[in-house]
Curated annotation (Swiss-Prot):
Flagellar protein involved in flagellum axoneme organization and function. GO terms for cellular component: axoneme; cytoplasm; motile cilium. The keyword Repeat applies. This is Cilia- and flagella-associated protein 43. It comes from Trypanosoma brucei brucei (strain 927/4 GUTat10.1). WD repeats lie at residues 46-87, 91-132, 184-221, 303-342, 428-468, 529-569, 589-628, 911-951, 1129-1170. The lineage of its organism: Eukaryota, Discoba, Euglenozoa, Kinetoplastea, Metakinetoplastina. Pfam families: CFAP43_N (PF23185), WD40_CFAP43 (PF23184).
């Protein structure tokens, strides 16, 4: 058996480099070096911290290693000597995203992305020490990759998700690195590499995008035949290697434009690295590192790891089984040195695993338990779902019994030949179970530890003939702290000794006494040890007298426990004085350290792993551990399922899949026949929904309820949104207005209307300021001491002012206070002008609103008069006997509801959808709901009801004998004289009344015409006034606009500085971009010029070689032949000159002519040599010309960039001059010479005809004032320079404080990282779920469940409370009745005692004793009855309190306070 330890797996693909024939991979805190088939481990640093990234420079022989601590340190080694040269601390805060050397090894670049993206550059100085030369911040964009250009180290490309940033001038000591940003259009980049033609970027769907560095544009370069993303790129010579997300590796020949598929790996390609052999390439995928031969497309595994983190390590027979988080299994056989990876495609995550007999049992977070055999092939023997809750831990007796637990339930499962069968379960736990361990006393007992520190001893009773298996709780103990892991050491009938890794980071030994009375006081440990700095994670038994433990510090400790394997006397907690037997530092600190450990063999060997894919295999537990091994042979193994053991033999799963399928098919056939028969019988009456299954019907009902609930919820939120919008409008646009919006509409034309002006509510503070400004301005005008430019300007006419203000309204009190436009050139004056203009605008608006209100009141009065006239017309028409009025009689003015300002928040029936209005008219109870508009119309109609108007008509009663409708009717020929006389009088009276009625009707019709005319006249008058008011409003609006423009002009003085500053900053920003572009072009120009000069030198060398070759040919055959040499030389010279002119061809050996054949062949060889040399020169000349064209192209771009930069510099200078002219208020100063006579108004007058004479003394005074102003300017300029210097000092102080802030933020992030790390460790140790979304879903489900349960409990509590109240009332009545009986009995006893004493019969001792005994018996019975009733009351009260506490926990607090 090999005694050397070995390591499986590696940290990440970023911790991979190829150094000559060696492959270096970071594994934990060390580096695995593979050379050919042998591997070894090298600990470059302390080994306590993980290796992050590796970078190697073959030219300089430097190896850079990052060590991830609380911050990141960079170590520099000389390799392969492994000599430590340098350590640079704090190169990154969390981790290094990418680290890369330039092609010449002179520059190292580090990319960090947390807290912000930063690229740091180090140059290799003398002595091969790295010196930081530059650092560039890229902001908050997450970058992925770095790449240097070929044969250059002064620039680098940084890959972003949607673009590329190019940093230039990294090696310049004068300039800081300049950044050029190039964004893509519709591409998401995953990888990049700098090649010969430019920057290649890998995008989605197999696309490779080429970035042209000169033109700064992108174009599609290659389209690979794959739908996956391009995740890795590498150029090696003329081949471009392309790695994809699906594991395909393509090659693309840049010269031939040919693409081919090299190999399919099946795993996502992460990195591609070059090797010393140009025919090989190193491919790093997510799970392995492979060397691929380009010619043969054969692959050789360099190193491999599992696809996910390690959860459990098992030793089954001679195999080491690695159980991964995703369910995959990795087996390692030491005898054959082979490792097999078996992917298990289950959607669950693995929680724990253990060995039962010859099978491995794995538990999942979905509640499933599966058993596997791993001897020859990995196969699933059995599976079953134990619980709906996620499982947390498992343990076994190693033979046939398995115990698993979810949150609060422990399940016992019997295992027979790998078949799983549920035996029993126990749910007596109040808290979550975290750890399970099998007892050591040989019985079927399990110790279960909870997260509150309790340890329960569960005994599995087994099956019998009459009953099923059961679980009993023998004993419960409470420890002082919860445990991370524990291990039973010794057990008998009295005590159980356990070894514990506690959460307080101590290792302890407890004695669990079986006879101990249950107390609330926790147990105290017997011995305390501090084996692990960060606390222990796992414990295992190592032989009979020792244990092996591992912790978060990455150490494995072996300790002797022989003195714990007995019953110990009770002792106070003491510190263990014995030191561990062995200590091994195997894994780095962080990420939980060692989380899984298993004993390998009887020689003290063990295997351990953590929350990654690195596994240490130590065959012999001796110190020190020597790591040297041959890499195992990896093979992929497929999982198989045993047909007879694919399911568990429980109640519903005992039938095989084939039998179930046959039964279902037969049942479906019978059901199909019954359905066809039923359809034939009841086709007309059967509905389609009758065939729905109950589950489908229930699902449909649930969907309907969900849609109804969603609709109601949407309606509710829309109503809430509408209310919020109305509230916002009312509070921010209505309540703040002193005068709300309103309008007046013409009586005849609805399009003619006039609006008022909105006015906000006055502010008291603003009114005070306005009052003070007016007073100050009035005092300023009165004193006339202020200088004004307007006084220097001559006006054509003093009274030629804008007269629109006079026609718009009365003059304002601020008209005389306003500044002239020319005088508003300082900040204070602009402020005063703004306030005065605001007062002026407010005055104009108020003046117009007064006229508006006057017209509105008048219109209201006229509308009332028109309504009265219309009413009079209606009554007149009724008197005239017409029931309906003609349209031309009644005047109907135009009505607009918006004339009332309050209607803005009212909704009328005309604004509602008629369909919705029909639904809203009737309420649910069938009563008619009258809308407000209908109610107002009804009120108006009722108010208009009056007495019936008498109609004007002839009202003369006809005599009865003349009415043919009566019985007294007498025909005219039969009437008497008297009747004839009466009828004549009747006719006469009818004629008179007819004339009178006609006259009244004519008068009424004239009155109607007058009323109609009056209505039209008043309406026309109102309309004319509205037109006039509209004109006035237009003038006022124009005046307000003009005043607001003056406000804008005054406000521009305040905004001028900011505007000029923004303009200046924009120009500077564009200038910086152009400068970065120019520096990048300079770098590109130098690189291409260097290539051109090298190519030109190669051309000259080839020309010299050709000349030397021709010269040397003269001394070689055939030109040395004495007969033909001179002739052939002349012929060769002639041929060469003609061939250069294109007039001759290469001679053929078969056409020798008279020349001897051997000499002619030699002559032809010389010609071919010349042709080959000439072709080589032409080819090199073409390359040189192409490079020259590229240089010229770069020069052209540089000129364009330089011209643009010059333009930006001119724009910058213009901005500076604009600042001097506009911001500093500079005016031209005119110096008057001594004795000069000049008019100071001449420069602003139309001509020089008007001037004034000045004395010489006045001129002298003016000059003195000018010189004094120069002195003042000098003082101001010095003061401004001092202020500028102080501003620079403040800027420097600000930068220093910002640096201090950055330092403090960095320390805060480090502390936060430490806290998050510790929280992650606690989370991993406690087994809590780390998915926030899952926790939120669980909490939501928990809330809903608690809500439903609590509602049921509330209802139950109310029923119980009412029942208890009734019982209490009954008990009270019963107690009152019993008290009355007791009182009556007491009185009777007292009376009998008195009578007895009077009679003297109590002297009989026998009777007295008998009565005394009976009295004592009665008293005891009554006392017992009272005690029972009191206990009953107390029990009922406690029941009420318990129900309250269970239903609402806050009631429990109130109950306690009340009890106190």
């Amino acid at each position: 058996m090999a005694t050397n330890a070995r390591i499986l797996g590696f940290n990440s693909p970023s911790a991979l480099v190829a150094a000559g024939d060696d492959f270096l991979l970071g594994a934990g805190g060390g580096i695995v070096i593979r050379r050919k088939e042998e591997s070894s481990q090298w600990i470059p640093c302390e080994g306590r911290y993980a290796i992050g990234a590796l970078a190697f420079s073959p030219s300089a022989g430097l190896l850079c290693v990052t060590e991830v601590k609380l911050d990141v340190s960079l170590h520099v080694f000389r390799f392969p000597e492994r000599h430590h040269l340098q350590c640079i601390d704090n190169v990154a805060t969390v981790d290094v995203q990418h680290m890369l050397f330039s092609s010449d090894g002179e520059m190292l670049a580090l990319l960090t992305c947390i807290p912000t993206t930063c690229v740091t550059f180090y140059s290799a100085a003398r002595g091969n020490r790295l010196v930081k030369c530059a650092s560039t911040e890229l902001g908050g964009v997450f970058c992925k990759h770095l790449t240097f250009p070929l044969h250059r180290h002064d620039c680098i490309a940084v890959l972003e998700p949607h673009g590329v940033r190019i940093a230039c001038n990294m090696d310049s000591a004068t300039f800081v690195p300049s950044i050029l940003t190039l964004s893509s259009k519709g591409h998401y980049f995953h990888s990049c590499v700098w090649g010969t033609e430019g920057l290649y970027c890998g995008a989605g769907r197999g696309q490779v995008v080429l970035l042209d560095e000169l033109r700064t544009d992108m174009k599609n370069y290659i389209n690979c035949e794959t739908p996956h993303n391009v995740t890795a790129l590498l150029q090696n010579g003329t081949l471009l290697f392309i790695g994809t997300e699906c594991g395909d590796v393509f090659t693309y020949n840049i010269d031939q434009k040919a693409q081919r598929l090299l190999v399919r790996l099946g795993r996502s390609v992460v990195r591609l690295l070059t090797l010393p052999d140009v025919n090989d390439v190193l491919v790093a995928t997510s799970t392995d590192v492979t060397k691929i031969s380009v010619d043969t497309a054969q692959s050789v595994f360099v190193r491999r790891r599992s696809a996910s983190d390690t959860v459990k390590l098992l030793v089954l027979g001679g195999l080491v089984v690695i159980v991964c988080l995703d369910g995959s299994l990795v087996t390692y056989d030491q005898d054959t040195n082979t490792a097999g990876h078996t992917p298990v495609r289950f959607p669950e995550k693995v929680v724990d695993a253990c060995v039962v007999g010859s099978v491995a049992v794995v538990v999942y977070d979905s509640g499933f338990v599966r058993s596997f055999t791993v001897e020859n092939t990995v196969s699933v023997v059995s599976q079953m779902k134990v619980s709906d809750c996620p499982l947390t831990a498992c343990t076994s007796d190693g033979v046939s019994l398995l115990a698993v637990c979810d949150k609060n339930v422990v399940h016992f499962i019997e295992v027979a030949d790998g078949l799983l069968e549920t035996a029993a379960s126990s749910d007596i736990f109040a808290c979550a179970v975290t750890n399970l361990r099998w007892a050591v006393n040989g019985g079927r007992s399990v110790l279960a530890a909870c997260n509150n520190g309790e340890v329960h001893n569960l005994r599995f009773t087994g099956k019998c003939d009459s009953a099923s298996a059961g679980v009993t709780v023998d004993m419960t103990w409470r420890l002082d702290f919860p445990v991370n892991d524990f291990l039973p050491l010794y057990g008998d009938g009295d005590v159980i000794n356990i070894f514990v890794h506690s959460v307080d980071k101590d290792t302890k030994m407890y004695a669990l006494e079986r006879q101990r009375v249950k107390e609330s006081k926790p147990l105290r440990p017997y011995f305390l040890m501090r084996d692990h700095e960060c606390g222990g994670n796992v414990l295992q038994r190592l032989g009979g007298d020792s244990i092996i433990s591992a912790g978060g510090d990455g150490r494995v400790v072996v300790r002797d426990i022989s003195h714990y394997l007995m019953k110990l006397p009770p002792v106070p907690p003491t510190k263990e004085k014995k030191h561990p037997l062995k200590e091994f530092l195997l894994r780095p600190f962080g990420r939980g350290g060692i989380t899984c450990l298993s004993v390998w063999n009887a020689a003290g060997g063990f295997v351990c792993g953590g929350n990654d894919s690195v596994v240490h295999l130590v065959p012999v537990g001796k110190s020190p551990i020597h790591y040297s091994w041959s890499e195992p042979f990896w093979h992929q193994r497929a999982i198989s399922t045993s047909p007879s053991r694919a399911s568990s033999p429980s109640d519903a799963e005992t039938l095989s899949a084939e039998r179930s399928r046959c039964r279902i098919i037969s049942a479906l056939a019978d059901l199909r026949m019954e359905v066809e028969k039923l359809l034939q019988e009841r086709t007309p009456t059967v509905r389609a929904e009758d065939f729905l299954l109950p589950e489908q019907r229930q699902a449909f009902n649930e969907e309907c309820e969900m849609e109804i609930h969603k609709a109601r919820e949407d309606d509710y939120y829309s109503l809430v949104h509408n209310e919020f919008v109305q509230h916002t409008i009312k509070t921010e646009c209505w309540d703040v207005m002193e005068v709300q919006r309103s309008k007046i509409v013409s009586m005849t034309d609805p399009e003619t209307e006039v609006h008022n002006f909105h006015l906000r509510k006055p502010c008291a503070q603003r009114a005070k300021i306005q009052k003070k400004i007016k007073l100050m301005r009035a005092i300023q005008i009165k004193t006339e001491e202020c200088f004004t430019l307007s006084s220097l300007v001559k006006r054509a006419k003093e009274g030629n002012l804008c007269t629109e203000q006079q026609v718009c309204g009365p003059p304002s009190d601020v008209d005389e206070l306003l500044y002239d436009t020319l005088d508003v050139y300082t900040g204070p004056r602009a402020t005063i002008q703004l306030i005065l203009l605001e007062c002026k605008i407010l005055h104009e608006k108020k003046s117009f609103n007064i006229r508006f209100d006057t017209l509105r009141e008048r219109k209201s009065r006229e509308l009332n008069l028109i309504a009265e006239r219309n009413g009079r017309c209606v009554r007149i028409m009724q008197q005239l006997g017409e029931h309906t009025c003609p349209p031309n009689v009644l005047f109907t003015p135009v009505f607009d509801i918006e004339e009332d300002p309050q209607t803005v928040f009212e909704v009328f029936d005309s604004e509602i959808d008629p369909e919705l209005l029909k639904l809203a008219v009737k309420s649910d109870d069938g009563e008619l709901v009258v809308s407000p508009s209908d109610e107002a119309a009804l009120k108006t109609w009722m108010d208009g009801l009056e007495k019936v108007t008498e109609v004007l008509r002839v009202n003369v009663p006809i005599p009865p004998f003349a009415d043919n409708s009566l019985e007294q009717y007498v025909p005219p020929e039969e009437r008497s004289d008297e009747q004839q006389r009466i009828f004549e009088e009747y006719e006469k009276e009818v004629a008179e009344q007819t004339v009178l009625i006609n006259e009244k009707k004519e008068l009424l019709r004239g009155e109607v015409a007058a009323l109609v005319k009056a209505n039209m006249t008043s309406a026309k008058a109102i309309d004319d006034e509205i037109d006039v008011l509209r004109t006035d409003r237009m003038l006022v609006a124009q005046l307000v606009d003009e005043l607001e423009l003056h406000q804008v002009n005054a406000l521009c003085l305040f905004l001028l500085k900011k505007t000029i500053r923004n303009k200046f900053l924009g120009v500077k920003r564009e200038e910086e971009d152009l400068l970065c572009r120019l520096r990048q072009l300079d770098s590109l120009y130098e690189y291409r010029l260097k290539l051109y000069l090298a190519s030109e030198a190669r051309v000259q060398d080839c020309i010299e070689e050709e000349k030397n070759m021709i010269t040397d040919m003269r001394c070689l055959p055939p030109f040395t032949d004495p007969d033909w040499g001179e002739r052939l030389n002349r012929r060769f010279t002639t041929w060469r000159s003609k061939y250069e002119d294109g007039l001759a061809k290469v001679p053929e050996p078969t056409r020798s002519g008279v020349v001897p054949i051997p000499l002619w062949e030699q002559y032809c060889q010389c010609c071919r040599a010349v042709v080959e040399a000439r072709d080589k020169i032409i080819h090199l000349r073409g390359e040189a010309d192409a490079l020259n064209d590229e240089v010229v192209e770069v020069e052209t771009e540089k000129k364009k960039a330089q011209f643009a930069l010059d333009d930006k510099e001119k724009a910058e200078e213009a901005c500076r001059k604009e600042v001097i002219e506009k911001v500093l208020d500079i005016q031209n100063l005119y110096t008057l010479q001594q004795g000069q006579v000049q008019d100071e108004n001449a420069m602003v007058s139309d001509d020089f005809t008007d001037f004034s004479i000045r004395w010489v003394k006045n001129i002298t005074d003016y000059n003195d004032l000018i010189f004094a102003s120069f002195d003042e300017i000098r003082s101001l300029m010095s003061r401004s320079s001092q202020l500028r210097q102080s501003m620079k000092t403040c800027s420097w102080e600000t930068e220093r404080l910002l640096y201090c802030i950055g330092t403090l933020e960095m320390e805060l992030r480090q502390l936060h990282t430490l806290r998050v790390t510790r929280q992650m460790q606690e989370t991993i140790h406690t087994g809590a779920v780390t998915s926030l979304e899952r926790e939120i879903n669980k909490m939501d489900a928990r809330i809903e469940a608690v809500r439903s349960v609590m509602s049921k409990k509330v209802e139950e509590r109310n029923r119980v409370i009412s029942k208890l109240k009734m019982q209490i009332n009954d008990r009270r009545a019963e107690n009152q009745y019993l008290n009355n009986q007791v009182q009556a009995l007491t009185n009777s006893v007292e009376d009998k005692k008195a009578v007895w004493g009077m009679l003297g019969e109590h002297n009989n001792d026998k009777d007295r004793l008998r009565e005394r005994m009976r009295e004592l018996y009665e008293n005891s019975e009554l006392e017992e009855l009272a005690r029972c009733q009191q206990e009953e009351l107390v029990r009922l009260k406690n029941e009420v309190d318990r129900l309250r506490e269970a239903t609402f926990p806050s009631f429990a607090v109130v109950t306690r306070r009340t009890a106190r």
